[in-house]
């Protein structure tokens, strides 16, 4: 069984990101989070393309951070065991980028959507990858059921105000596509 190393490293980065928010007084302040690297509430990045990655290391408050860290610890380890740390981290970061892309498209249609922060796009990507990979493997029906329940709960939570449905949807699509590419590559070697 492959040992998960990427997820704990990502968790440390998320905690460091939140510590920076606390030190700068940015936690819970949308305008301050935007200055730190959140995605803007319009589709214009004004050349600040680093935001398509940095938003994922910031969190609105303690609860937001704790939920994402808990989910990353669970789902990240599953995917790392399925495909290895390097492939899992590629899936995660590709999902973050797909999440940002869909967020920016949606913000173009709804510029009052608000600034976006959080790792959930990458986490939803890992969830999508775990589902695709586990559905291709025999056995462990219990894991598949848990993943489907997590997906259902995740998208239900996405319906609440202030939660980025676009970010979650972009992440799961990116993660699912990356999982298919990773599996094809693994089958070829």
What are these regions (language model features)?
Residues 1-189:
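A detector for small-residue-rich transmembrane helices and their helix-helix packing motifs
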